[in-house]
Amino acid sequence: MALLEICCYSMECALTAQRNGADRIELCAAPKEGGLTPSLGVLRSVREHITIPVHPIIRPRGGDFYYTDGEFAAMLEDIRLVRELGFPGLVTGVLTVDGDVDMSRMEKIMTAAGPLAVTFHRAFDMCANPFNALKNLADAGVARVLTSGQKADAAQGLSIIMELIAQGDAPIIMAGAGVRANNLQNFLDAGVREVHSSAGVLLPSPMRYRNQGLSMSADIQADEYSRYRVEGAAVAEMKGIIVRHQAK
């Protein structure tokens, strides 16, 4: 049966995902940045209370995936911490300035991760040649690759995703970016073994007093009064589609 991974940005989101049928969680902070390394407090609380597999993201900042030496050193320290806390896997990715997988740094990441399953995230979609990148990641021992098929969303990139799947069984190709209940069946019919979804919704902040003339973000248009949450019903609907597909 296809595996459903849900991207979660808090302890509450992780609990919601687990209760509604998620098979695995990608744990992140900072949804507006596309996911950054969670805090130690969040890591510890999720490790204590969530029983399904959780893979924290290791990403020190938003933007591109070419990191300074200092940023990369911090990533290795975060990997060691995630390993010490007992997580079964992690999610990360590093590129060269030319859009290739940085194999030298990936070797160091794999050494630091040890027995943990490593997912190479959507830095893959920024690679100049996805098929060369996939071969390099297979050689590195990466467990899976999260990809939208190098398009803005996975529905647009499904043909490339299918080509990547045809390259072999490892790494596993996990489709993500815009995967929802209304298009999930297309991925299952295409033979995708793992899917990744945020299943998220923006909820209004409970704050009654609001200083509308002030923002904590450099983006003065940023909405300070909405919060990202995993929608349990969306997770359950997607899991139901997967179960019914398996029963065919």
Curated annotation (Swiss-Prot):
UniProtKB keywords: Cytoplasm
GO molecular function ontology, one term from the record: copper ion binding
Chief location: cytoplasm
Organism domain of life: Bacteria
Cell compartments where the protein resides: Cytoplasm
Pfam family, one: CutC
Cytoplasm keyword on record: yes
GO cellular component: cytoplasm
UniProt keyword annotation of DNA-binding present: no
PANTHER family per UniProt: COPPER HOMEOSTASIS PROTEIN CUTC (PTHR12598), COPPER HOMEOSTASIS PROTEIN CUTC HOMOLOG (PTHR12598:SF0)
Subunit structure: Homodimer.
Family under the similarity heading: Belongs to the CutC family.
Identification of the protein by name: PF03932 family protein CutC
